[in-house]
Amino acid sequence: MADYKHTLNLPQTDFPMRGNLAQREPEQLRWWQEHEIYRKQREAFADCPTFMLHDGPPYANGQIHVGHALNKTLKDIIIKSRHLLGYNSPYVPGWDCHGLPIEQKVEQKIGKPNQKVSATEFRAACRRYAAEQVALQKDGFMRLGIFGFWDQPYLTMNFETEAQIVRALRDIVAAGHVTQGFKPINWCFDCASSLAEAEVEYQDKTSYSIDVAFAVKDVAALAKIMHADVVPAAVDVVIWTTTPWTLPANVAVSIHPEFYYVLVEIEGWYCVVAEELIPALKSRWKKSADWRICGRALGKDLDRLTLRHPFIDRDVLLINGTHVTLDAGTGCVHTAPAHGVEDYDVCQQYGIDLIHCVLGNGLYNDDTPHFAGQHIFAAEPQIIELLQTQNRLIAVEKITHSYPHCWRHKTPTIYRATTQWFISMDKAGLRQKALDGLNEVAFTPDWGKPRLLNMIAHRPDWCISRQRYWGVPLCFVVDKQTGQLHPDIVNIMDKAASAIEQKGVEAWYELSLDTLLSGKEVDRYEKLNDVLDVWFDSGTTHYSVLKKRAELSYPADLYLEGSDQHRGWFHSSLLTASAITGKPPYKALLTHGFTVDEDGRKMSKSLGNVVDPNQVIKTLGADILRLWVASADYTAEVSLSPNILNQRADAYRRMRNTCRFLLANLHDFDPEKNSVAYEKLLPLDRYVIAVAHDLQEKIKKLYVSYDFHLIYQEIFNFCSVMLGGFYLDVIKDRQYTVAQNALARRSAQTAIFHIIEAMVRWLAPILSFTAEEIWRYLPGKREESVFLTKFYEGLQPLNDDFLSMHDWELLLQLREKVNAALEKARNQGIIGGSLEAMVVLHLPPQEYEIAARFEQELRFILIVSAVNVQPSAALSIEVQHAIGEKCERCWHYLPDVGTDHQHPTLCKRCIENVDGGGELRRFA
């Protein structure tokens, strides 16, 4: 028996079947670096329109985690896809380098500043630690295949950036947005510092819930106002609070001017509460006796009556406040302006001074009656006991409620009045500027817009000062007596910024006043050593980075971060840019969700469900992690687990093997010599090119709309269904059996070439390592790297008279029905493989016309040995065993096998392909 294997055009390629990504990817990284691909990309796209994605700086502390991997990979996918779309999209990665977490790490190593080491030594150690962390994270990000200016990142601790941060504050001061105030702000005892809104998170806390009686001083006046039917000997206004520790600071009780309040008698005791809350109070106070209403009045009529503090010799004013609600409590609100923003605001209206009795470490100061020197939380049981002793406690219980906690220490915070510097939301119209600007910003997903608008509309002034060591100094010079800024503060800050640009933040502490002021002013003024909130550092990178670096542009086209950044970087950037320019620093915001396990649980070491991206890279490779990112609907929580990663690895293998098969069928194809002109391509090949063309147009739109998970689905389905399940299966016969240079074979190779040229670009933003590997195996002259190209332009929509796209869809539907009939026949033992079959098709007019156009080549579309097409009113399919013997070369069952004595095991078609001029294929 002759061996005809040498007459077949079998696929062959050196492109590996297995990715072995963990081993190959580092080699690819080195190749990119050695060949300076990123620099060459910058040069290649320099004259293109720009697309500017500005990197929100991660904090320089610790190894990268899956949240980092998700965020950076999304950014990289966007930037690489924008290059394919013809944009110049430089990427400058950044790091947030100042702040408390770094201070804490350094304290653990060398001790607290001004105790074991000087403040100067401490700041230098912080700078070194931050640099080490940047280097660690940089290696992790680069290993993910992220392209960017890794040798020229921006760091908020770079001298030039620190100087620009001061200049940004200078401009905001000059615009009139900065104020000083003794106001209640979020305070953490463990940080010993104020906290920004973004540094506070809410967790459940168990607290005392108490109702406390405040005695009315002039009962007769109260009774008259309330038109009471009795003038009791004593009356109490009852408040409710979950912060008993704030009672020593109480100076007022607030009631709503438009709510009705009633004088109630309960078993001989008289009290005043909101009328609407009586049913709830009966239950909470457990007083089931008759509640007799003796008098009634609006809150505004009770304004400015005097009460007595329950355990301190102090008069307390009854005041009106519209912040009072009927959601809980008594309708009478305990008011301590040192410990609540609304309390502070309403007392300001009445000219009531606050009482400042809590120190920065959480202890009551020495002037606090009864509790001096005690920690506020530890003193609460004693406060409750004292209230009981004074017969002022009406009810007490413990409740669990949502309470602010420090995001770093996870410990409860308080509101505490301190002298701080603020960016005012309303003094110079900043709030309205920010709100107006947001209406011009595009949001993905769109629910981000009302969320951020609501935050801006209701946020307090921004406290920007911190009493820490490692940060950018405010560079304020103030009057020692009044605390007011020097009248020439803008020029002073200019001088300070110039010094910092040369020596870093240390320059501020080394600057003497006489270098900033004239001689006669030195004794009157002093420098402040407060540093800026780190959210101001990152929130001004639009000023210190985008506007400063020549390769970047302003405003940014896109900011992309996790959904928590509505209250963080998106927020602070909006406020600073609006304060400086009156407009947002970005045209669009995109947010992604947090990573959770496959059961939707937050990742934590205690649950054992943390996925380390570095470990994934070492085992599966970065491209699998990148594919996970692309496949996820990032607008919600993003699930990750070993099981999910294994599923993505399976999908990767499908796509890789599809590309390998395409490459293997191009082993002898030179696109310059062997390409077939479009009009000479077989209809099937024109069709698959059209499918790829339409898919590419869809993929372009999906990249623009950031719907990467849909791109993943489209490419995977194209590989699995259109190529693996149809086209590549159909053309195997043509590829393998016809003559090497036959038009039919070169036609298929031309289509394959166009498809892989397009597909490698579709994949490049997602599977960056694999796409570059594929690129090197493609035939023909080309750019050095896939990342130096744009989307492939060699695809065409369908443009012939043979079949329309709709006709092809009907044919594929018919093919599915034939496959189902073949499977049924296989199960019945009529046939084994599909090539053992002859199919008789009874087709309605439309399907009959389509099928008949293929004549005898329809069998290749259906992958059977024979087809008989008959017109019919209704569609039906018969499957019979094909007549004849199996051809040794093409495996078709045909009657003419054995009719040639020189090739007794071949069919006539194969004999023609081996010895003759080759078969003629016209359609498939």
Curated annotation (Swiss-Prot):
Protein name: Isoleucine--tRNA ligase
Binding site residues for L-isoleucyl-5'-AMP: 561
Family per similarity comment: Belongs to the class-I aminoacyl-tRNA synthetase family. IleS type 1 subfamily.
Highest rank taxon of the organism: Bacteria
Alphabetical keyword list: Aminoacyl-tRNA synthetase, ATP-binding, Cytoplasm, Ligase, Metal-binding, Nucleotide-binding, Protein biosynthesis, Zinc
Residues the entry annotates as binding ATP: 605
Domain notes: IleRS has two distinct active sites: one for aminoacylation and one for editing. The misactivated valine is translocated from the active site to the editing site, which sterically excludes the correctly activated isoleucine. The single editing site contains two valyl binding pockets, one specific for each substrate (Val-AMP or Val-tRNA(Ile)).
GO biological process, one term: isoleucyl-tRNA aminoacylation
GO MF, any single term: tRNA binding
Catalytic activity reported: tRNA(Ile) + L-isoleucine + ATP = L-isoleucyl-tRNA(Ile) + AMP + diphosphate
Motif 'HIGH' region, chain ranges: 58-68
Binding site for Zn(2+): 887, 890, 907, 910
Cofactor(s) this protein cannot do without: Zn(2+)
GO cellular component: cytosol
Species of provenance: Dichelobacter nodosus (strain VCS1703A)
Assembly and binders: Monomer.
